[in-house]
């Protein structure tokens, strides 16, 4: 997924900073996904997020350093109006539903409509069917979910925070897509104004950032 020509070489020494927001109903496992990804932790007890929590993750993808700011939002209906505060300027959105709960899947469709209305096609969307460890209790068909994701220009993923399945793939693929989107924007704007174009999406591109400065955050990965 690297950019063609000189774009890939130009981006090789850069650090990308991306904002990712998780959206979905309460009890679908958003917090469990983030904690499993960032800290490799899982709690069988339901974790209720009040308004939002914030975690960070550092990665190296094909020689490109990526700083992720991951916003985990509350799923309760009373917090829905706060959504725009958290997804504003996001580069990626992970829309989570519980495969055993048809209603949670239908609510994802509402989030997709809202995100497309507010942010257009510039945001990378991931639709995630979580709790695949409860396959026998599934109420959302795989074909229906994947077909819907394709129809709205999103990628679909199957995950289990409990069994640690599909989560690394989800975040890695999203990061690659966000890098590709940022590089396309850079090339479209030309060398002289690439930063301005990327800034519209909230992307921060730091040239030749020393590794020693890549500290901090709740979690990190090589």
Curated annotation (Swiss-Prot):
Residues bearing a lipid moiety (S-geranylgeranyl cysteine): 218-219
Matches recorded under Pfam families: Ras
The UniProt record lists the keyword Zinc-finger: no
Cysteine methyl ester PTM sites in chain numbering: 219
Residues that hold GTP according to the record: 26, 29-32, 43-44, 46, 48-49, 75, 130-131, 133, 161-162
Disulfide bonds: none
Cofactor: Mg(2+)
Binding site residues for Mg(2+): 31, 49, 72
Record text on activity regulation: Regulated by guanine nucleotide exchange factors (GEFs) including ANKRD27 and RABGEF1, which promote the exchange of bound GDP for free GTP. Regulated by GTPase activating proteins (GAPs) which increase the GTP hydrolysis activity. Inhibited by GDP dissociation inhibitors (GDIs).
Position of sequence motif Switch 2: 74-92
Result when mutating residue 31 to N: Defects in GTP-binding. Decrease in integrin-binding
Primary location class: endoplasmic reticulum
Propeptide: 220-222
Domain notes: Switch 1, switch 2 and the interswitch regions are characteristic of Rab GTPases and mediate the interactions with Rab downstream effectors. The switch regions undergo conformational changes upon nucleotide binding which drive interaction with specific sets of effector proteins, with most effectors only binding to GTP-bound Rab.
Protein name: Ras-related protein Rab-21
UniProt lineage: Eukaryota, Metazoa, Chordata, Craniata, Vertebrata
Gene: Rab21
């Amino acid at each position: 997924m690297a950019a063609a020509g000189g774009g890939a070489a130009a981006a090789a020494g850069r650090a990308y900073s991306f904002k990712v927001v998780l959206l979905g109903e309460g009890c679908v496992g958003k917090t469990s996904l983030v904690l499993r990804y960032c800290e490799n932790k899982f709690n069988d007890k339901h974790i209720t997020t009040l308004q939002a929590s914030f975690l960070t993750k550092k990665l190296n993808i094909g020689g490109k350093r990526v700083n992720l700011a991951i916003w985990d939002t509350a799923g309760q209906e009373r917090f829905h109006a706060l959504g725009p505060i958290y997804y504003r300027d996001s580069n990626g959105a992970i829309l989570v539903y519980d495969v055993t709960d048809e209603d949670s899947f239908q609510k994802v469709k509402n989030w997709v409509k809202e995100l497309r209305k507010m942010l257009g096609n510039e945001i990378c969307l991931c639709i995630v069917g979580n709790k695949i460890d409860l396959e026998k209790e599934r109420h959302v068909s795989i074909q229906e979910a994947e077909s819907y994701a394709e129809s709205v220009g999103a990628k679909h993923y199957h995950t289990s925070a409990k069994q640690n399945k599909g989560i690394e793939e989800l975040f890695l693929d999203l990061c690659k897509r966000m890098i590709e989107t940022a590089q396309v924007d850079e090339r479209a704007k030309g060398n002289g104004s690439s930063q301005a174009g990327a800034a519209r999406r909230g992307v921060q591109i730091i040239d030749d950032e020393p590794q020693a400065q890549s500290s901090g955050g709740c979690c990190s990965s090589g």
